[in-house]
């Protein structure tokens, strides 16, 4: 498979599925945390939409990063997952820092609350989980034909 096709494949799959994995964790965290954020989710259903749109660009960039990993790292599941998780966290933090400094994009109070330093766990853990899970399953998704047997097995 050509590098450009792998970059497009990884980037799009990460951008579409990655934020959904993060939102799943976020909903579970809010449900079990018994914090006032539960009221925000009930009152503002746009919370999930903001979470997905906030995570789509970092997920796309993480997918491109995972696609561009050298063959030695990309062909081993552990290293690919480690790189995907760390890359997801770093790219998400850089992206959120840029958005907070632009202030024009962070106009709503809820959006600023999500991106503030007080809710670090709301950004880091979903990005880490999405990066690791997507790096793990990316070779099993349709459209990618890798002949490396170690990469194709889920064990």
From Swiss-Prot:
List localization entries: Cell inner membrane
- Report if keyword Kinase is assigned: no
Keyword match Cell inner membrane = yes
Q: Name one GO cellular component term.
A: plasma membrane
UniProt keyword terms in alphabetical order:
Cell inner membrane, Cell membrane, Membrane, Transmembrane, Transmembrane helix
Please list the disulfide bridges. Answer: none
Coiled-coil region(s):
none
User: In terms of one coarse class, where is the protein primarily found?
Assistant: membrane
Residue ranges that the UniProt entry lists as topological domain Periplasmic: 33-36, 103-113
Q: Which ranges does the record mark as transmembrane?
A: 12-32, 37-57, 82-102, 114-134
Topology term for the membrane: Multi-pass membrane protein
Other remarks on this protein = Disruption of this gene leads to hypersensibility to nitrofurazone.
What protein name does the entry list? Inner membrane protein CbrB
Q: What is the lineage of its organism?
A: Bacteria, Pseudomonadati, Pseudomonadota, Gammaproteobacteria, Enterobacterales
> What gene name is listed for this protein?
cbrB
């Amino acid at each position: 498979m050509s590098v450009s096709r792998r970059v497009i494949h990884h980037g799009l799959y990460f951008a579409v599925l990655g934020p959904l994995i993060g939102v799943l964790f976020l909903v579970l965290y809010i449900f079990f945390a018994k914090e006032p954020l539960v009221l925000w989710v009930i009152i503002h259903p746009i919370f999930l939409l903001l979470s997905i749109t906030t995570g789509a660009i970092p997920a796309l960039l993480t997918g491109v990063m995972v696609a561009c990993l050298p063959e030695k790292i990309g062909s081993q599941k552990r290293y690919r997952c480690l790189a995907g998780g760390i890359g997801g966290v770093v790219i998400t933090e850089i992206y959120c820092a840029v958005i907070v400094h632009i202030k024009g994009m962070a106009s709503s109070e809820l959006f600023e609350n999500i991106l503030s330093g007080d809710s670090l766990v709301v950004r880091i853990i979903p990005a880490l989980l999405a990066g690791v899970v997507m790096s793990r399953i990316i070779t099993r998704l349709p459209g990618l034909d890798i002949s490396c047997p170690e990469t194709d097995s889920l064990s």
